[in-house]
Every structure is written in structure tokens, then in C-alpha cells.
């Protein structure tokens, strides 16, 4: 378990109120996913997953998915997935996948929003994330987690705006705080964004 994962889990415990604990996850797994699926008429469901992992293998093929699925009456689904992949060598295959899927299946008066941001970082050499960078990412994760408390009062456009702002902050943090072990060079940050909506 990485130090960042431990800190994130501590953060979840500190911020947990009501449904927050089950509405978010933090992971170092290869496949990161968020799934929101309300099951009763008039219900709302929110899921957020924040992933951070290092990859020192010859293949970079991590997946990041956000799925919002609505199939009841007057319900709402919001799924947000963020994944950061720190590449620690020069791989021969780079095929990361970032997907967002929002589905409204025979749902009257329903709304579904899926947002996925994936960051692949590295210049083909070992790198380390500074303690300052870890702390800054914790703040971003906390801000994303707080969306769960207010999303019922937010429009989809407002949620998209907040996630876009969070993604911009993550990109800035990685560019500044991910340092090559030899102390030189730009780590390089590639970000993909996927958004899907259904109403």
C-alpha cells in the first residue's frame, strides 16, 4: 500500500458523513472505475473513484471508466473517475483507455452524467512524487469527494465545471511535483477527458 493510498484512506475516514464513505473509493488498481446506478424511482446515486498507480512494466494499458446508468423514474446518476498513471520506464506498448458512458434506459425524467479523466505521466525514466505533490493531490481528491454532498443541488454543467477545474489542478501538480530521479527533465503529462450525458 503506497503512502498516498494510506493518506487518502485516512482522508475518507476523516470526511465520512452519511453516504460519503460508500460513495467514493481510492485505489492503486490497474483498472479504475466509478459506477452510479440508482435503483428506485426518484432516487439519486453518486460514485467517485480516484486512482493513482505506478507502472514499471513494458506495457501501459490501464483503464479508467465512469458509468452512469439510469433506468427508473425521475432518478439521477453521477459517476466521476480520475486515474493517474506514473510510468517508470520506457514501455514498448502504450494503450491506456479512458471511457465515460451515460445511459438513460426507458427512464422518464431521469439524468445521467459520466466524467472520466486519465493522466499518464512519464518520460521513460524513474520518477518520484514529492510530499508536497501528495498533499496537493489529497486536497483535489477531497474537493471531488465533497461534490457528493451537494450534487443534488448542482446542474450537470456545474459538476462538469468542477471536475474540469480539478483536472487542471491535477495536471499542474503532476507537472511541477513529479521529479525524475536523476533530478532533471520534464516528466511530461498527457491527459484525456471523456464526458457523456443522457437525459
Please state what every model-predicted region is.
Residues 8-18:
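Bacterial N-terminal signal peptides
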Residues 1-8:
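Bacterial N-terminal signal peptides that target proteins for export
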Residues 24-199:
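Low-complexity repeat regions of mature extracellularly deployed or surface/particle-associated proteins
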Residues 19-23:
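Sec/Tat signal peptide C-region and signal peptidase I cleavage site
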